[in-house]
Regions:
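Glycine-rich beta-strand-turn "strand-cap" elements at beta-sheet edges
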Residues: 98-110
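C2H2-type zinc-finger recognition helix
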Residues: 36, 87
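Charged, low-complexity amphipathic helices and coil/IDR segments
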Residues: 1-4, 102-103
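A generic "cationic amphipathic patch" detector
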Residues: 29, 52, 102-103
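Low-complexity, intrinsically disordered or weakly predicted helical/coil tracts enriched
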Residues: 6, 89, 105-106
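A structural feature that tracks compact, well-ordered secondary-structure segments
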Residues: 8, 15-21, 27-33, 42-45, ...
């Protein structure tokens, strides 16, 4: 099960999702960017930072659901996961991103 980045436009802003190519599930969502070029740089940053454990922050939402963020070397969040049902599921999500994000192609849906 590989991954794919979907680059999208919403009004005047751009964003991307990293999805499982197998089931289409969104695994990681970006912040919104003002330019397409910045969103593409965000995808490149996810690919570059995904392999490194230190770039992941394991967090818990206000409703108790575990999730994670992926950060760049400067500490800026470059992607936020879905909410998971357990810490094990969240950790599996991190492993999936580490494995599939670096080589995932981009589908430009703008």
């Amino acid at each position: 099960m590989s991954g794919i980045f979907h680059l999208k436009r919403s009004g005047t802003q751009y964003m991307f999702n990293l999805k499982s190519a197998g089931n289409g599930e969104v695994v990681l969502t970006s912040e919104r960017y003002t330019t397409k070029q910045n969103a593409e740089a965000g995808i490149a940053s996810v690919k570059a930072n995904a392999p490194y454990d230190a770039r992941y922050q394991k967090l818990t939402a206000s409703n108790g659901s575990p999730y994670f963020t992926l950060t760049a070397t400067n500490g800026q969040v470059i992607g936020t996961s879905e909410l998971y049902s357990s810490t094990t599921a969240r950790d599996n999500g991190i492993t999936w991103v580490k494995t599939h994000a670096p080589s995932a192609p981009t589908a430009d849906l703008t």
